[in-house]
């Protein structure tokens, strides 16, 4: 701008001022003012975070102290004086400073001497870590060289097993006697306190007592003579009819087996030989046949009453009412 303006204007152009130009007069400035005045107090940018780690900040504070040692409050004060960014949010970064002091081996805690004013211990740098930064540059730390395999430092840095693993070492003489030589095989021996489920036997049909068989008295039962044997009722097995059993026995007292063993005689040749013929005046033989092959709770005894023709009474457990009966209309049932 020196070739356009006079020397006083050239000096103004070199100064840190802001110039305001008009669109009507593009070559001439209308006004000028300092940049800080135009920016105003509300537009001041906040301070930037310094590009240093917390370890570098602590090392700066220690090396800046006259005796190369400083208290914790001295470290806080040094950081806030040098870096305005740490004026705010003190609790956050101060906690980080304390953690780095306690976790890093390069910082050594020195107790305060007796009689020295003040409180708190001092912090200093380990003599082996004085040159941990490259050429005094606090932005870059030197990498620690790996110790040799046989050096004492490598033995010190070796990770020792935890106490739980050391305590469980079987090679020790005390634990070798305490531990069993071999664990029991679960597949061969059952576990203690466990029992196999016991199999409950299902009650089968008990043998019939001949004394508990049904006895029939009366002329009606003898006259009918022929009772049918059920072909397919409840799937109960029936004993085959004996060959020497009489067909028309007129005895007043006989067993139920002789009644069940009697086969009906076909009335005509047109009827099938295997199909039984129903008898109107007969008692439901299906009930009697089924009761002989069922479990013991279903066994019962029926006795005809001699005083009442066609009537009978029950002995034993209650008579099951859902069994089909074929009883003539004149028959009277009486239950006790």
Curated annotation (Swiss-Prot):
SMART domains according to UniProt: FH
Gene3D superfamilies registered for this protein in UniProt: Winged helix-like DNA-binding domain superfamily/Winged helix DNA-binding domain
UniProt keyword Glycoprotein present: no
Domain of life: Eukaryota
Disruption phenotype: Deficient mice show postnatal growth retardation secondary to severe structural abnormalities of the stomach, duodenum, jejunum and decreased intestinal uptake of D-glucose and levels of the intestinal D-glucose transporter Slc5a1.
Region (Disordered): 140-214, 227-252
UniProt keyword list: DNA-binding, Nucleus, Transcription, Transcription regulation
Broad class of where this protein is predominantly found: nucleus
Compartment list: Nucleus
Compositional bias annotation for Low complexity: 242-252
DNA-binding region in chain numbering: 48-139
Record's GO cellular component terms: nucleus
GO molecular function, one term: sequence-specific DNA binding
InterPro entries, alphabetized: FH_FOXL1, Fork_head_dom, FOX_domain-containing, TF_fork_head_CS_1, TF_fork_head_CS_2, WH-like_DNA-bd_sf, WH_DNA-bd_sf
GO biological process: heart development; Peyer's patch morphogenesis; proteoglycan biosynthetic process; regulation of DNA-templated transcription; regulation of Wnt signaling pathway; visceral mesoderm-endoderm interaction involved in midgut development
Its biological purpose: Transcription factor required for proper proliferation and differentiation in the gastrointestinal epithelium. Target gene of the hedgehog (Hh) signaling pathway via GLI2 and GLI3 transcription factors.
Protein name: Forkhead box protein L1
């Amino acid at each position: 701008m020196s070739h356009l303006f006079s020397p006083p204007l050239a000096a103004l152009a070199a100064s840190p001022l802001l110039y305001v130009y008009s669109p009507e007069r593009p070559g001439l400035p209308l006004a000028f003012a300092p940049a800080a005045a135009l920016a105003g107090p509300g537009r001041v940018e906040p301070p930037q975070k310094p590009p240093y780690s917390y370890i570098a900040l602590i090392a700066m504070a220690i090396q800046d102290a006259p005796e190369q040692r400083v208290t914790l409050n001295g470290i806080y004060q040094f950081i806030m004086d040098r870096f305005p960014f740490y004026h705010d949010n003190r609790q956050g970064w101060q906690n980080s400073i304390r953690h780095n002091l306690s976790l890093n081996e390069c910082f050594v805690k020195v107790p305060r001497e007796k009689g020295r004013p003040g409180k708190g211990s001092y912090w200093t740098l380990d003599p082996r870590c004085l040159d941990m930064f490259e050429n005094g540059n606090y932005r870059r730390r030197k990498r620690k060289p790996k110790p040799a395999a046989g050096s004492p430092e490598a033995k010190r840095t070796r990770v020792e097993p935890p106490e739980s693993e050391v305590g469980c070492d079987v090679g020790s003489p005390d634990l070798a006697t305490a531990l069993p030589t071999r664990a029991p095989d679960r597949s061969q021996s059952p576990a203690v306190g466990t029992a196999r489920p016991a199999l409950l036997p299902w009650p089968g049909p008990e043998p019939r007592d001949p004394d508990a068989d049904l006895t029939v008295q009366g002329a009606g039962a003898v006259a009918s003579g022929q009772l049918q044997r059920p072909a397919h009722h409840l799937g109960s097995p029936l004993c085959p009819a004996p060959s020497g059993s009489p067909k028309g026995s007129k005895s007043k007292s006989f067993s139920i087996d002789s009644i069940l063993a009697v086969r009906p005689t076909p009335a005509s040749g047109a009827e099938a030989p295997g199909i039984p013929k129903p008898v109107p005046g007969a008692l439901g033989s299906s009930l009697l046949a089924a009761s002989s092959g069922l479990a013991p709770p279903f066994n019962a005894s029926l006795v005809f009453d001699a005083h009442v023709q066609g009537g009978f009474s029950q002995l034993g457990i209650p008579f099951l009412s859902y069994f089909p009966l074929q009883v003539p209309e004149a028959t009277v049932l009486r239950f006790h």
